[in-house]
Regions:
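Active-site helix of classical SDR
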Residues: 118, 154
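The beta1-alpha1 cofactor-binding region of Rossmann-like NAD(H)/NADP(H)-dependent oxidoreductases
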Residues: 37, 57-68, 100
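Substrate-binding pocket helix/loop in short-chain dehydrogenase/reductase
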Residues: 94-95, 99-104
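Residue(s) in the substrate-gating loop at a strand-loop-helix junction
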Residues: 138
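SDR active-site lid
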Residues: 171-232, 250
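Conserved glycine-rich cofactor-binding loop
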Residues: 5, 12-13
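Conserved glycine-rich Rossmann-like NAD(P)H-binding loop of the short-chain dehydrogenase/reductase
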Residues: 26-43
Protein backbone atom coordinates (compact mmCIF):
# COMPACT_ATOMS: atom_id res chain seq x y z
CA UNK A 1 0.00 0.00 0.00
CA UNK A 2 3.02 2.31 -0.02
CA UNK A 3 2.28 5.31 -2.20
CA UNK A 4 -1.48 4.77 -2.01
CA UNK A 5 -3.76 7.45 -0.57
CA UNK A 6 -6.86 6.41 1.36
CA UNK A 7 -9.65 8.70 2.59
CA UNK A 8 -12.05 7.46 5.29
CA UNK A 9 -15.21 9.31 6.31
CA UNK A 10 -16.62 8.87 9.81
CA UNK A 11 -13.10 8.01 10.94
CA UNK A 12 -13.11 9.41 14.48
CA UNK A 13 -14.04 6.09 16.12
CA UNK A 14 -15.19 2.51 15.60
CA UNK A 15 -15.11 0.99 12.15
CA UNK A 16 -13.80 4.11 10.45
CA UNK A 17 -10.85 4.46 12.80
CA UNK A 18 -10.06 0.74 12.52
CA UNK A 19 -10.09 0.95 8.72
CA UNK A 20 -7.82 3.99 8.79
CA UNK A 21 -5.36 2.25 11.11
CA UNK A 22 -5.20 -0.96 9.07
CA UNK A 23 -4.53 0.84 5.79
CA UNK A 24 -1.94 3.05 7.50
CA UNK A 25 -0.28 -0.01 9.05
CA UNK A 26 0.06 -1.43 5.53
CA UNK A 27 1.90 1.67 4.33
CA UNK A 28 -0.84 3.88 2.91
CA UNK A 29 -1.18 7.61 3.48
CA UNK A 30 -4.56 8.08 5.18
CA UNK A 31 -6.91 11.04 5.57
CA UNK A 32 -9.36 10.75 8.47
CA UNK A 33 -12.58 12.74 8.05
CA UNK A 34 -15.10 13.47 10.78
CA UNK A 35 -17.63 16.20 11.56
CA UNK A 36 -15.65 16.96 14.72
CA UNK A 37 -12.10 17.99 13.86
CA UNK A 38 -10.81 17.45 17.41
CA UNK A 39 -12.12 13.88 17.48
CA UNK A 40 -10.62 13.25 14.04
CA UNK A 41 -7.25 14.53 15.27
CA UNK A 42 -7.43 12.33 18.37
CA UNK A 43 -8.17 9.30 16.18
CA UNK A 44 -5.25 10.23 13.93
CA UNK A 45 -2.87 10.05 16.88
CA UNK A 46 -4.32 6.69 17.93
CA UNK A 47 -3.83 5.44 14.37
CA UNK A 48 -0.20 6.57 14.42
CA UNK A 49 1.99 7.08 11.35
CA UNK A 50 1.45 10.82 11.81
CA UNK A 51 4.01 11.60 9.10
CA UNK A 52 1.58 10.32 6.46
CA UNK A 53 -1.85 10.82 8.00
CA UNK A 54 -4.12 13.84 8.02
CA UNK A 55 -7.25 14.68 10.04
CA UNK A 56 -9.89 17.01 8.61
CA UNK A 57 -13.35 18.20 9.57
CA UNK A 58 -15.97 17.10 7.06
CA UNK A 59 -19.75 16.77 7.31
CA UNK A 60 -20.80 14.55 4.41
CA UNK A 61 -24.20 16.26 4.38
CA UNK A 62 -22.46 19.40 3.11
CA UNK A 63 -21.02 19.12 -0.39
CA UNK A 64 -18.80 22.17 0.08
CA UNK A 65 -17.12 20.48 3.07
CA UNK A 66 -16.52 17.33 1.02
CA UNK A 67 -14.98 19.38 -1.79
CA UNK A 68 -12.81 21.27 0.70
CA UNK A 69 -11.54 18.04 2.28
CA UNK A 70 -10.85 16.54 -1.13
CA UNK A 71 -8.98 19.67 -2.19
CA UNK A 72 -6.75 19.57 0.90
CA UNK A 73 -6.11 15.87 0.31
CA UNK A 74 -5.08 16.43 -3.30
CA UNK A 75 -2.89 19.36 -2.26
CA UNK A 76 -1.04 17.20 0.30
CA UNK A 77 -0.91 13.85 -1.49
CA UNK A 78 -1.68 14.64 -5.18
CA UNK A 79 -4.10 11.73 -5.56
CA UNK A 80 -6.84 9.58 -4.02
CA UNK A 81 -6.63 5.83 -4.60
CA UNK A 82 -9.29 4.64 -2.15
CA UNK A 83 -12.30 6.49 -0.74
CA UNK A 84 -14.16 4.76 2.11
CA UNK A 85 -17.73 5.96 2.72
CA UNK A 86 -18.14 4.98 6.36
CA UNK A 87 -19.98 7.96 7.89
CA UNK A 88 -23.39 6.89 9.13
CA UNK A 89 -26.04 7.31 11.80
CA UNK A 90 -28.76 5.06 13.19
CA UNK A 91 -32.42 5.42 14.07
CA UNK A 92 -34.70 3.16 16.08
CA UNK A 93 -38.43 3.76 15.85
CA UNK A 94 -41.61 2.18 14.54
CA UNK A 95 -42.27 2.91 10.86
CA UNK A 96 -45.77 4.19 11.65
CA UNK A 97 -44.55 6.54 14.40
CA UNK A 98 -41.17 7.86 13.26
CA UNK A 99 -40.57 11.56 12.78
CA UNK A 100 -40.07 12.32 9.10
CA UNK A 101 -37.57 15.10 9.83
CA UNK A 102 -35.35 12.59 11.66
CA UNK A 103 -35.75 10.05 8.87
CA UNK A 104 -34.65 12.65 6.31
CA UNK A 105 -31.67 13.56 8.48
CA UNK A 106 -30.61 9.90 8.52
CA UNK A 107 -30.84 9.64 4.73
CA UNK A 108 -28.85 12.87 4.33
CA UNK A 109 -25.89 11.16 6.00
CA UNK A 110 -26.24 7.49 5.15
CA UNK A 111 -27.35 7.72 1.52
CA UNK A 112 -27.09 11.22 0.08
CA UNK A 113 -23.77 11.76 1.85
CA UNK A 114 -22.45 8.61 0.18
CA UNK A 115 -23.61 9.84 -3.23
CA UNK A 116 -22.09 13.28 -2.66
CA UNK A 117 -18.71 11.79 -1.73
CA UNK A 118 -18.74 9.51 -4.77
CA UNK A 119 -19.60 12.39 -7.09
CA UNK A 120 -16.83 14.50 -5.57
CA UNK A 121 -14.02 11.95 -5.82
CA UNK A 122 -14.85 10.24 -9.13
CA UNK A 123 -13.37 13.02 -11.35
CA UNK A 124 -10.00 12.72 -9.57
CA UNK A 125 -10.06 8.94 -9.96
CA UNK A 126 -11.05 9.21 -13.62
CA UNK A 127 -8.07 11.45 -14.21
CA UNK A 128 -5.80 8.74 -12.78
CA UNK A 129 -7.68 5.97 -14.62
CA UNK A 130 -7.87 3.97 -11.42
CA UNK A 131 -9.45 3.99 -7.98
CA UNK A 132 -11.65 2.15 -5.51
CA UNK A 133 -14.74 3.40 -3.69
CA UNK A 134 -15.69 1.36 -0.63
CA UNK A 135 -19.18 1.80 0.79
CA UNK A 136 -19.72 0.56 4.35
CA UNK A 137 -23.29 -0.70 4.37
CA UNK A 138 -24.85 -3.31 6.70
CA UNK A 139 -26.45 -6.73 6.80
CA UNK A 140 -29.54 -4.60 7.54
CA UNK A 141 -29.29 -3.65 3.87
CA UNK A 142 -30.17 -7.27 3.07
CA UNK A 143 -32.43 -8.20 5.99
CA UNK A 144 -34.67 -5.34 7.20
CA UNK A 145 -34.83 -4.67 10.92
CA UNK A 146 -38.10 -4.19 12.77
CA UNK A 147 -38.06 -0.79 14.48
CA UNK A 148 -35.19 0.09 12.18
CA UNK A 149 -36.94 0.71 8.87
CA UNK A 150 -35.21 4.02 7.99
CA UNK A 151 -31.74 2.64 8.76
CA UNK A 152 -32.41 -0.56 6.81
CA UNK A 153 -33.89 1.39 3.90
CA UNK A 154 -30.84 3.65 3.75
CA UNK A 155 -28.56 0.61 3.62
CA UNK A 156 -30.69 -1.14 0.99
CA UNK A 157 -30.26 2.08 -1.02
CA UNK A 158 -26.49 2.09 -0.47
CA UNK A 159 -26.31 -1.53 -1.67
CA UNK A 160 -28.25 -0.68 -4.84
CA UNK A 161 -26.11 2.42 -5.39
CA UNK A 162 -22.94 0.35 -5.18
CA UNK A 163 -24.18 -2.22 -7.69
CA UNK A 164 -25.23 0.41 -10.22
CA UNK A 165 -22.13 2.57 -9.77
CA UNK A 166 -19.86 -0.46 -10.15
CA UNK A 167 -21.28 -1.12 -13.63
CA UNK A 168 -21.15 2.55 -14.61
CA UNK A 169 -17.60 3.22 -13.42
CA UNK A 170 -15.94 0.02 -14.58
CA UNK A 171 -14.98 1.55 -17.92
CA UNK A 172 -13.17 4.33 -16.03
CA UNK A 173 -11.06 1.82 -14.11
CA UNK A 174 -12.92 2.57 -10.87
CA UNK A 175 -14.07 -0.32 -8.70
CA UNK A 176 -16.89 -0.14 -6.14
CA UNK A 177 -16.88 -2.49 -3.14
CA UNK A 178 -19.79 -2.78 -0.70
CA UNK A 179 -19.08 -4.12 2.79
CA UNK A 180 -22.00 -5.32 4.93
CA UNK A 181 -21.15 -5.93 8.60
CA UNK A 182 -23.51 -7.58 11.04
CA UNK A 183 -23.61 -6.48 14.69
CA UNK A 184 -20.41 -4.67 15.61
CA UNK A 185 -19.13 -3.84 19.08
CA UNK A 186 -18.78 -0.06 18.73
CA UNK A 187 -20.32 3.10 20.17
CA UNK A 188 -22.59 3.35 17.11
CA UNK A 189 -25.63 1.93 18.90
CA UNK A 190 -25.56 4.73 21.45
CA UNK A 191 -25.52 7.42 18.76
CA UNK A 192 -29.08 7.15 17.53
CA UNK A 193 -31.05 10.01 16.01
CA UNK A 194 -34.39 8.87 17.46
CA UNK A 195 -35.18 8.92 21.15
CA UNK A 196 -36.11 5.24 21.47
CA UNK A 197 -32.60 4.04 22.23
CA UNK A 198 -33.89 1.36 24.57
CA UNK A 199 -35.18 -0.68 21.64
CA UNK A 200 -31.75 -1.33 20.20
CA UNK A 201 -30.08 -4.63 20.80
CA UNK A 202 -26.82 -4.13 22.73
CA UNK A 203 -23.96 -4.05 20.26
CA UNK A 204 -21.74 -5.88 22.77
CA UNK A 205 -23.89 -9.03 22.54
CA UNK A 206 -22.34 -11.53 20.13
CA UNK A 207 -21.00 -8.70 18.00
CA UNK A 208 -17.77 -8.62 16.06
CA UNK A 209 -15.02 -6.07 16.58
CA UNK A 210 -14.40 -3.04 14.41
CA UNK A 211 -10.95 -4.47 13.71
CA UNK A 212 -12.52 -7.59 12.20
CA UNK A 213 -14.61 -5.42 9.90
CA UNK A 214 -11.49 -3.49 8.92
CA UNK A 215 -9.70 -6.72 8.01
CA UNK A 216 -12.66 -7.74 5.84
CA UNK A 217 -12.58 -4.34 4.15
CA UNK A 218 -8.86 -4.60 3.44
CA UNK A 219 -9.13 -8.16 2.14
CA UNK A 220 -12.10 -7.25 -0.05
CA UNK A 221 -10.16 -4.32 -1.46
CA UNK A 222 -7.06 -6.38 -2.21
CA UNK A 223 -9.09 -9.14 -3.85
CA UNK A 224 -11.26 -6.60 -5.71
CA UNK A 225 -14.48 -8.14 -4.39
CA UNK A 226 -17.90 -6.80 -5.30
CA UNK A 227 -19.42 -7.33 -1.87
CA UNK A 228 -18.22 -8.59 1.49
CA UNK A 229 -20.54 -9.78 4.27
CA UNK A 230 -18.89 -10.03 7.68
CA UNK A 231 -18.93 -12.21 9.68
CA UNK A 232 -19.28 -15.02 7.14
CA UNK A 233 -21.87 -16.65 9.40
CA UNK A 234 -24.33 -13.96 8.26
CA UNK A 235 -24.13 -15.11 4.64
CA UNK A 236 -26.49 -18.10 5.16
CA UNK A 237 -28.97 -15.78 6.91
CA UNK A 238 -28.91 -13.39 3.95
CA UNK A 239 -29.41 -16.25 1.48
CA UNK A 240 -32.17 -17.75 3.63
CA UNK A 241 -34.02 -14.42 3.71
CA UNK A 242 -33.83 -14.20 -0.08
CA UNK A 243 -35.38 -17.66 -0.42
CA UNK A 244 -37.69 -17.85 2.61
CA UNK A 245 -38.37 -14.33 3.93
CA UNK A 246 -41.39 -15.45 5.95
CA UNK A 247 -39.34 -17.98 7.87
CA UNK A 248 -36.66 -15.43 8.75
CA UNK A 249 -39.25 -12.84 9.78
CA UNK A 250 -40.90 -15.44 12.03
CA UNK A 251 -37.57 -16.17 13.69
CA UNK A 252 -36.80 -12.48 14.14
CA UNK A 253 -40.23 -11.89 15.69
CA UNK A 254 -39.56 -14.70 18.17
CA UNK A 255 -36.19 -13.20 19.04
CA UNK A 256 -37.73 -9.76 19.57
CA UNK A 257 -40.14 -11.17 22.14
CA UNK A 258 -37.15 -12.11 24.30
CA UNK A 259 -35.66 -8.61 24.29
Amino acid sequence: MEGKVVVVTGASMGIGEAIAKLFADHGASVVLLSRDSSRAEAARHRVGHTDRTLALACDVRQREEIDRALGVTLHHFDRVDVWVNNAGVGMRDAAADMEMSVCRELFETNFFGTIACMQAVVPAMREEGDGTIINISSVAGHIPLAFGAPYSASKFAVNALGKAARMELKRDGIHVLTVCPGYVRTEFGANMLAARKGNIRPQSVRGITAERVARAVYKGYRKRRREVIVPWTMIPAVKLYQLFPGLVEWGMAKAMQKL
